[in-house]
């Protein structure tokens, strides 16, 4: 989808309070280090180096924001959060960043949707499930949520079907999709879903569309 291809760097922040206030829908990408988060963002936006992928997983420790929409008319923002759970960083750094991400996911007012990336060969980890539990109140209040099973090309079709079934049970509802940057599996579908989330049909508009045509229109 062309809308995703308009993505451009907006800002980066090491602390939550350094992030600017955003008045458009914000979609956060989160996941365990090495789940393919940066690759996913770069594939969706068709930009090889938009999201930085460190050669040492767990070393990217900033929240990066990317604007979407025409220049001067941003209509959504992507947030790339640091990967979590990798042993290469110190315990104190891991705990600090887990707290920063938790605060972001629970309190960020402009947050409209969360995309949780997961390696289907590993399934949802304890940290993934802890994240799900932390944001569940917001999801129940209307926050959109997608579990994206990356690296789908590593699985057979039967294995993909099994992974989808198991993850849907673990996630307790919500969207679950397979994704492969290599095979471009799920790319268009995910891009379309994110666009819909960033451009919700207002109830008033939906009601007008649902009305039968008037006699003057017949």
Swiss-Prot record:
Keyword Nucleotide-binding belongs to the record: yes
GO terms for MF: GTP binding; metal ion binding
CDD domains cross-referenced by the UniProt entry: YihA_EngB
Requisite cofactors: Mg(2+)
One cellular component (GO) term of this entry: cytosol
GO BP terms, alphabetized: division septum assembly
Keywords: Cell cycle, Cell division, GTP-binding, Magnesium, Metal-binding, Nucleotide-binding, Septation
Residues given in the record as Mg(2+) binding sites: 38, 60
Annotated binding of GTP, by residue: 31-38, 58-62, 80-83, 150-153, 179-181
Superkingdom, natural source: Bacteria
Domain EngB-type G: 23-200
Family named by the database record: Belongs to the TRAFAC class TrmE-Era-EngA-EngB-Septin-like GTPase superfamily. EngB GTPase family.
HAMAP family named in the record: GTPase_EngB
PANTHER family linked: ENGB-TYPE G DOMAIN-CONTAINING PROTEIN (PTHR11649:SF13), MSS1/TRME-RELATED GTP-BINDING PROTEIN (PTHR11649)
Function according to Swiss-Prot or TrEMBL: Necessary for normal cell division and for the maintenance of normal septation.
Name of the protein: Probable GTP-binding protein EngB
UniProt organism field: Acidovorax ebreus (strain TPSY)
Organism phylogeny: Bacteria, Pseudomonadati, Pseudomonadota, Betaproteobacteria, Burkholderiales
């Amino acid at each position: 989808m062309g809308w995703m291809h308009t993505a451009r760097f907006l800002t980066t922040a090491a602390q939550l309070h350094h992030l600017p206030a955003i008045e458009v829908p914000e979609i956060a990408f989160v996941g365990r280090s090495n789940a393919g988060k940066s690759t996913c963002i770069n594939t969706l936006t068709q930009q090889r180096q938009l999201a930085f992928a460190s050669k040492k997983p767990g070393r990217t420790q900033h929240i990066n924001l990317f604007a979407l929409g025409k220049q001067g008319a941003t209509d959504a923002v992507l947030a790339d959060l640091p990967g979590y759970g990798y042993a290469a960083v110190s315990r104190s750094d891991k705990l600090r960043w887990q707290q920063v991400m938790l605060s972001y996911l629970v309190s960020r007012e402009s947050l409209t949707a969360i995309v949780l990336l997961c390696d289907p060969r590993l399934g949802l980890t304890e940290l993934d499930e802890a994240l799900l539990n932390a944001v569940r109140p917001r999801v129940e209040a209307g926050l959109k949520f997608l579990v994206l099973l990356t690296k789908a090309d590593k699985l057979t079709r039967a294995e993909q079907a099994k992974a989808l079934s198991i993850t849907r049970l673990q996630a307790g509802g919500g969207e679950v999709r397979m994704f492969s940057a290599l095979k471009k599996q799920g790319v268009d579908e995910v891009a379309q879903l994110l666009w819909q989330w960033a451009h919700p049909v207002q109830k008033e508009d939906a009601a007008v569309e649902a009305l039968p045509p008037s006699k003057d229109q017949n």
